[in-house]
Amino acid sequence: MTVGARLRSKAASSLVGRRPLGRSRRAGDEETDAIVEHLEGEDEDPASPDCEREEGGRRAGTPSARRVHLAALPERYDSLEEPAPGDKPKKRYRRKLKKYGKNFGKAISKGCRYIVIGLQGFAAAYSAPFGVATSVVSFVR
């Protein structure tokens, strides 16, 4: 018996006698079966033609020892992924433009009002001496 076979049989016998914590042992426990299959699979000679290996390093046709855990999702599932980054800046940019547009419109309307009032006052002040002079001249005639 080789050293590898002795260690394999020792590991297999220790796994059979052990019971997983927190649950009862049932016949054909999947975890121990997967480990034992994995240990038994190492017995084959890697140079033999029937022992072809795949890219991942395991033999073709042998089941892997990995397990997939599935969980039921709640009815109202909110994904953890963020929305596409292209959508957010457009909305933000629109909001910013709208805000600046409102403020700019207010500034223009108030500014135009003050400019008109200022021009009217300037025109009245500018034309007042001539108006007075004209009325005085026409009165003197």
Curated annotation (Swiss-Prot):
Pfam family, one: RDD1
Highest taxon of source: Eukaryota
Membrane topology: Single-pass membrane protein
Gene Ontology biological-process entries: regulation of response to drug
Annotated transmembrane regions: 115-137
Stretches with biased composition (Acidic residues): 30-47
GO cellular component terms, semicolon-separated: 9+0 non-motile cilium; membrane
Major location category of this protein: membrane
Localization, UniProt: Membrane
Chain residue ranges for the region called Disordered: 1-94
Annotated function: Regulates drug efflux through modulation of ABCB1 localization and activity.
Designated name of the protein: Required for drug-induced death protein 1
